[in-house]
Every structure is written in structure tokens, then in C-alpha cells.
Amino acid sequence: MSDMTVTLSDVAREAGVSLATASRAINGSANRTVRPELRERVLAAAARLRYSPDANAQAMARGRTTALGLIVHDIADPYFSTIASGVTAAAERAGLVVTLASTDRDAGRELAFVELMQRQRARAIIVAGGRYDDDTANQALADALVEYRSRGGGAAAVGQPLLGVDTVVIENRSATAELARQLHGRGYRRFAVLAGPPRHLTAHERLDGFRTGLADLGAPLDPDLVVPCAFTRDGGYEAMERLVAQGVVGRGGSGQPIDAVFAVNDVMAVGAMAAARAAGLDVPGDVAIAGFDDIITLRDITPSLTTIRLPLADIGAMVTELALAPDNDAPRLVPVDGEVILRDSTPPLG
């Protein structure tokens, strides 16, 4: 291979490292470091291939910045605002200022923000929130982050490990399986699930874990009682209205009554409680309700809501540390377990 045709990607393949690692080893970075053994491997590969680094790329990689970009789906959702508070606190300790993008789950807006952060030479980008079952959109964002990291930036995510970056992974399935076991232990047998958007991977994982937990106990979930809806308070409200219309909520309905409703996030559960009250139903007297996340606003909800607690502010700090950490050749995955918190909305039956 002649030196006129050698690219940084060729060097990365020759050294057996990622493109981002090869870039940092050769171009340098004011923000990220490479382990000495990786740097030596990359430089040796570059020498073998007679690679000539690009002066402009080196200048950009070494440029200093105090910006950290944070992408969330909906900053009005306390789940994301609490993660953002953890990111902001960790960024401030590192002398950085957070630039926030609330994308309303729009993949195009995510890409545009990554491109903006690249132009502004932000030190790192964090993507917080579950992905959708959309290979094209996920790959496009992953490619944009590879390009960003190849120029010296750091990147990390909260959610599914689909973007090729260090990721804080929420153990959704095991958490909801445990919730199913504990509610079953309190006497609940017939459930409905407010399942969120059909292609949202976090919603799918939470539903799947709950369904598996019930099946293992010999109490299979009726598919007719799985209600897709928006991942919002209003989505939970409308989904509960549909269950009431089916006649399965409360003892006076036309169908076989359910014991409890599990909403795959807390804001949906809050909406479901409001819809139940609007229909003249008592929570938990007529129907028990549980959620997921333990968002901070639950302290104002009556009855207190059974949920799965996530350390949301700590998750924000963790993902910031990953985004700012020295480069690692393979993406690091940090699992976070949820903790079932039983409260007044799901009292023992009988």
C-alpha cells in the first residue's frame, strides 16, 4: 500500500483498534488520553504503512473547549431532568459547561446536535435515553459519534449499547421480573401493562421482563391487556381510559377485572392514576398501580406509588465520567440495577 492511499482507518485496522483510538494516538487530544501500549501499537502500524497525519485534524483534536453536549429525549420528564442534574454536577466539577438538546425523540435532531458539537469542538457528548428499534437511525448516530470521537471528542450513552460508545446500561428486564415476583407475592394475579411505544427498546425490555417474571410464576400476562401508548403522562392517562372502556377495571365492569396495572415508567403511572380517579375509581381499592424509575415528583403523589428505583442523578454522574475518561479500545458497559420499592398503591391483597 503506498503512502498516498493510506488512511487513518487503514492504520486503525492494522493496529486492531478503533478509529477514535487511532486518531487520539496520532493526532493527540487536549481532552482524551490513550494508554501507552495502545499508542505504541498505533504508531508502529502508522510507521509500517507510512501514514502521514493530517495537520488540520491534529489542530482540531488538540483544540481546547469547555463544552459538554447532553442529548435527552424530553427534559420536561423528571427522569431526564434528574439525569441531567447529575451530568451538570459532574461537568461542573470537571470545569465544563453543559449544552443541552431536548430532541423529543427525533433522530434527525440528535444527528444535528452531534454535528453542532463537532463544529464547536465540544469536549464530549452524552446521549441519554433508550433507543428505538430502528437500525438505520441507530447506525447513523453511531457513525456520527465515530466521526466526532475520531477528532478527539469523548462520547458515552445511557440506554442500550447500540452506539459503539461507553454506555450505562439499565437492567430493565431483571428489575421488572422482580417487580412481578413481589406483586405476585402480595396476591396479585391479573395484570394489565401500559407498555409505551411498540418500537421503544426500553419499553420493550420492561414489558418483556415483567411478562417473563409472571410466566415463571404460572400467571401469564394476557396479551389483550398489554396497551401500547405514548411514553408520557398523557399516554398513561389515555391507556387507562381504554382499559376502563374495556370494562376490566373495577368490580362493576363488563369484563374480568384486573388486579393491578404496571406502567413502564412513572409519568405514565401518574397519568393512569389520574384517569382512574376521573372514572370514579379508587386507587388502590379498585385497581393497584405500579411504575418504574422513582422520579422525584412521586413524593407529591397520593397514594404513594410502587415503583422501581433507579439512581438517576448517580447515572448522570457515571455517564459523565465515562465520557471524560481516557480512551478504551472496546466500549465499556456499566450495568445499573433497579430496586423494587413497594408503596401504598399496591397493598397486600386478602
Question: Each predicted region: which residue ranges?
Answer:
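Hinge/beta->alpha junction and helix N-cap segments in small-molecule ligand-binding domains
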Residues: A55, V72-T82, A101-R109, R131-T136, ...
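Short beta-strand segments enriched in small/hydrophobic residues
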Residues: T21-R24, R62-D74, R190-G196
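Flexible loop/turn connectors
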Residues: V244-G350
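Short, well-structured alpha-helical segments in soluble
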Residues: L111-A122, V127, Y237-G255
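Short acidic/polar active-site loop segments enriched in Thr and Asp
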Residues: S18, T66, R123, R189-R190, ...
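Alpha-helical recognition/docking segments in bacterial nutrient-uptake
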Residues: M1-D3, T7, R62-R181, G185
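N-terminal helix-turn-helix DNA-binding module of bacterial transcription factors
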Residues: M1-T65
